[in-house]
A protein has these predicted regions:
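Generic secondary-structure signature for well-ordered alpha-helical cores
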Residues: 25-32, 77, 101-105, 133-140, ...
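Helix-loop-strand module that forms the ligand-binding subsite of alpha/beta enzymes
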Residues: 57-147
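A short beta-strand-loop structural module common to alpha/beta enzyme folds
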Residues: 32-42
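Glycine-rich phosphate/pyrophosphate-binding loop and the adjoining helix
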Residues: 141-205
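N-terminal beta1-alpha1 ligand-phosphate binding loop
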Residues: 2-30
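Cysteine-cluster motifs in flexible loop/terminal segments that predominantly coordinate metals
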Residues: 42-72, 199-205
Length: 205
């Protein structure tokens, strides 16, 4: 069983990393393998709606998105962490997630998702809601904890002082581990839920 964690901060070892690393420790204690990928300062462009991924099975731009895609397919759970910029996620991370979720043809049903956000002060819940949209449109159950998954601090040292925030991360990791293991047992016993043929409609005809 494996969890992929994406650090969407340009700072490799900052506040977002502090939150994700706290989760990593609990995952490992629970027997769950982890891999942490840092977006860092990689120049990741947004989707240009070319449709090339529908023919190729991968994004036409060969960058970190296509490196992460097979890791995403192989994992049982995905944790996405972001700093808060203007009550929103880091734009580089959003570009990565837009292309990652749209270009990958594999079924994401019942992979467990969780989002983690860090800020000096405000904008956390708006960013948290934004990131969860990627999971809820993809048939991915969303793991929750004892509070919204956030940590406060202006740097990693301050984030380490947010004792409640760190506890939230540990609780989230325990709940996510339980949910992934429960889903695995369910898949072994019952299989995945039946899917109807997809129906698409537009508001304007």
């Amino acid at each position: 069983m494996k969890v992929l964690l994406i650090n969407g901060s340009p700072h490799e070892k900052g506040c977002t990393y502090t939150a994700l690393h706290e989760m990593e420790k609990v995952f490992r204690e629970s027997g769950v393998e982890t891999e942490l990928v840092s977006v860092g300062t990689n120049p990741i462009r947004g989707c240009i709606a070319c449709g090339g991924c529908r023919k190729k099975g991968a994004c036409v731009f060969s960058d970190l998105v296509n490196e992460i895609a097979p890791k995403f397919e192989a994992c049982d759970g995905l944790v996405v962490g972001s700093p808060v910029y203007y009550a929103s996620a880091n734009a580089t991370l959003v570009a990565l997630l837009d292309r990652l979720f749209y270009s990958t043809p594999f079924d994401k049903t019942m992979k467990v998702g969780a989002s983690v956000v860090s800020a000096r002060r405000g904008g956390l819940s708006a960013t948290f809601d934004e990131l969860n949209k990627y999971f809820t449109i993809s048939g991915m159950p969303v793991a929750s904890g004892q509070y919204w998954n956030s940590i406060h601090g202006n740097n990693a040292d301050e984030a380490q002082q947010d004792l409640e925030g760190l506890q939230i991360m540990r609780t989230l990791a325990r709940n996510m581990s339980f949910l992934m293991k429960s889903i695995q047992l369910g898949k072994e016993s019952f299989g995945l839920p039946e899917k109807e043929p997809r129906v698409g409609t537009n508001f304007i005809r």
